């Protein structure tokens, strides 16, 4: 039996071993299809990262599909039922690295746009694609750089669907209409090294820091709101000492992370953390890394169109959530764009034997096409 257009393209993309930041020719496949539809293509290569910006039309509004061609490493090959870069269909599921995150979505986007343009060759507004090979990596030379380039020439995105795997049990059951912000602090508490038998001749930074860390962990940073849970504080990494049992460490390194709502700013978080550390009399340095600001699309044409499209396909409205980690949507939201995430079920992403239900790819294609119908048809 011949594969459907979306399944065939998904297989082609999965077969390319595009472990971040490699693209391995995935974008060339997409560009070839988009050129045939009349898209203007602009390649944007920054160091080891391959990106492209594609646009069809010059009018407003500018609607964009955003996504990434890179994937995480396959992990232990012995644990895969089938080779991760040899797309395989088993019992109605397409298996392979990137099937759900997010080569399946990319295939759905392309086929949806092909079908939409076939029906609406003179559609309203403009359609764009923003594709990167640096979403699973350090996100330095990917979407953020493309956004900077577009903003510098005042080419602003109005509405954007990011194809991240937003769904939980069935495709379209969840639409992410925002994401929490993320900021990490790398704290170094300074003390004086010494022998454990002579603590009066040393200054143990671990002992000094623990009460402050306990206070930070116990703090209620905010109460959240209708769209976001309360801000969370977590400590993922601690390091002190030489490994010897008789040496008091001279330094204590602590890494902590905040996932924060729109009730807080990153500057307010910094101020409150420094206030606690200062109150405990610590000698310290903190290096801050802001991964992304929170964003929210709570109203607007895009959200209404996506919800309507999902409801038309599933006969049930999606839940609107802001849970989970960060995504490239945070960079696009900086343009003032309406941003939502809609993609496959995320149960197997970043795992061995990653897979996506083939029927879900067909449904997702319909959802994308119906969204275009509502907005630009």
Curated annotation (Swiss-Prot):
Zn(2+) 1 binds at residues 68, 101, 164. Pathway: Amino-acid biosynthesis; L-lysine biosynthesis via DAP pathway; LL-2,6-diaminopimelate from (S)-tetrahydrodipicolinate (succinylase route): step 3/3. Keywords: Amino-acid biosynthesis, Cobalt, Diaminopimelate biosynthesis, Hydrolase, Lysine biosynthesis, Metal-binding, Zinc. Its cofactor is Zn(2+). GO terms for cellular component: cytosol. The keyword Magnesium does not apply. It holds the Pfam family M20_dimer. Binds 2 Zn(2+) ion per subunit. Its EC number is 3.5.1.18. Zn(2+) 2 binds at residues 101, 136, 350. It catalyses: N-succinyl-(2S,6S)-2,6-diaminopimelate + H2O = (2S,6S)-2,6-diaminopimelate + succinate. The active site is at 70, 135 (proton acceptor). NCBIfam families: dapE_proteo, PRK13009.1. Homodimer. Catalyzes the hydrolysis of N-succinyl-L,L-diaminopimelic acid (SDAP), forming succinate and LL-2,6-diaminopimelate (DAP), an intermediate involved in the bacterial biosynthesis of lysine and meso-diaminopimelic acid, an essential component of bacterial cell walls. Belongs to the peptidase M20A family. DapE subfamily. This is Succinyl-diaminopimelate desuccinylase. It comes from Vibrio cholerae serotype O1 (strain ATCC 39315 / El Tor Inaba N16961). The gene is dapE.
């Amino acid at each position: 039996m011949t594969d459907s257009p979306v399944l065939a393209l998904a297989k082609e993309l999965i077969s390319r071993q595009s472990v971040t930041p490699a693209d391995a020719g995935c974008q060339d496949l997409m560009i070839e299809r988009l050129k045939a539809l009349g898209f203007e293509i602009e390649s944007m290569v920054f160091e080891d990262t391959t990106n492209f910006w594609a646009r069809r039309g010059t009018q407003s509004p500018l609607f964009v599909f955003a996504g990434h061609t890179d994937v995480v490493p396959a992990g232990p090959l012995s644990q895969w039922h089938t080779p991760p870069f040899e797309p395989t269909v088993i019992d109605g599921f397409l298996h392979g690295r990137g099937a759900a995150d997010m080569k399946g979505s990319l295939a759905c986007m392309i086929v949806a746009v092909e079908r939409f343009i076939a029906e609406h060759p003179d559609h309203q507004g403009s359609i764009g694609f923003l594709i990167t090979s640096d979403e699973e990596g350090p996100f330095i030379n990917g979407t953020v750089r493309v956004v900077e380039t577009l903003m510098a020439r005042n080419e602003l995105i109005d509405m954007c669907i990011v194809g991240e795997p937003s769904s939980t049990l069935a495709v379209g059951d969840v639409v992410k209409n925002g994401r929490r912000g993320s900021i990490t602090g790398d704290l170094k508490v300074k003390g004086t090294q010494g022998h454990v038998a002579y603590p009066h001749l040393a200054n143990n930074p671990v002992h000094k820091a623990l009460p402050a860390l306990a206070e930070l962990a116990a703090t209620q940073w905010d109460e959240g709101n209708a769209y976001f849970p309360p801000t969370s504080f977590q400590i993922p990494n601690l390091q002190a000492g030489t490994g010897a049992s008789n040496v008091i460490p001279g330094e204590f390194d602590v890494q902590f992370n905040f996932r924060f709502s729109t009730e807080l700013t990153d500057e307010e978080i910094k101020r409150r953390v420094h206030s606690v550390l200062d109150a405990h009399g610590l000698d310290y340095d903190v290096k801050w890394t802001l991964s992304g600001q929170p964003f929210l699309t709570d109203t607007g044409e895009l959200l209404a169109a996506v919800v309507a499209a999902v409801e038309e396909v599933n006969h049930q409205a999606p839940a609107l959530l802001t849970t989970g980690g960060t995504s490239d949507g945070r960079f696009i939201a900086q343009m003032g764009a309406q941003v939502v995430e809609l993609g496959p079920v995320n149960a197997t992403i970043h795992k061995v034997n990653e897979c996506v239900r083939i029927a879900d790819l067909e449904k997702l294609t319909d959802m994308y096409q119906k969204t275009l119908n509502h907005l630009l048809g």
